[in-house]
Amino acid sequence: MVEMNFKVDAFEGPLDLLLHLIGQLEVDIYDIPMAEITDQYMEFVHTMQEMELDVASEYLVMAATLLAIKSKMLLPKQELEIDYDTLEEEEDPRDALVEKLMEYKRFKEAAKELKEKEAERSFYFSKPPMDLAEYDDGTKVAELDVSLNDMLSAFNKMLRRKKLNKPLHTRITTQEISIDQRMDSVLEKLNLQVNHRLRFDELFEEQTKEQLVVTFLALLELMKRKLVEVEQAESFADLYVQGKGEEIS
């Protein structure tokens, strides 16, 4: 077994911990050895409890999930007469967990990349774009699933539009804007709307490149906390950010 050697406060949540354990074992994320991963995860939880640290409920929920998956995989296969005409591949008990891990990994990598861009642009100022079109007709937009790729595509399109407006760059020291501050700003802007709803690009108006990146990171964090949703009526249509009329606690 791999030696447990890490700080209890080093992880953002149970999925972050699982990715760390999988990386330590150097195993395929699509073929997780549930017995070993579950044992190490439970050792981590027990260590936190022995140190009299508060164990967040989400860690305990994941512990129960891992134990359930481990139990299913240890159950003996029933020997049944096989009808090869109707045979379907048996669902892997790990599939749902792997899907959550991959989605979290994509968000984490995207956030890391954007933070690197934020650091690169921290000493630059970009002239705001001219003549931004206002095309929101107030029509109710039906909710569809919006992927991280859809959001990154919309964000990159907005950056290209700023570039086409020929921003003037000058090296200056700018006031640092934290993600928490931008989260408050986004929620405040949404709460000012009657239906707590804004078109995606309206959250990024009159901002520098640095502020754009921070705003996008803030939006991802708000989605993670389920304080906002991003919706799209159909493929290639505008994205809308829907607030839930709540404040950050």
UniProtKB/Swiss-Prot annotation:
Transmembrane segments: none
Main location group: cytoplasm
Annotated compartments: Cytoplasm
UniProt keyword annotations, A-Z: Cell cycle, Cell division, Chromosome partition, Cytoplasm
GO-annotated cellular components: cytoplasm
GO biological process terms held by the UniProt record: cell division; chromosome segregation; DNA replication
InterPro entries, per the entry: ScpA, ScpA-like_C
Signal sequence interval, chain numbering: none
Complex formation: Component of a cohesin-like complex composed of ScpA, ScpB and the Smc homodimer, in which ScpA and ScpB bind to the head domain of Smc. The presence of the three proteins is required for the association of the complex with DNA.
The family this protein is said to belong to: Belongs to the ScpA family.
UniProt function note: Participates in chromosomal partition during cell division. May act via the formation of a condensin-like complex containing Smc and ScpB that pull DNA away from mid-cell into both cell halves.
NCBIfam families in UniProt: PRK00104.1-4
Record-given protein name: Segregation and condensation protein A
Organism in which the protein naturally occurs: Listeria monocytogenes serovar 1/2a (strain ATCC BAA-679 / EGD-e)
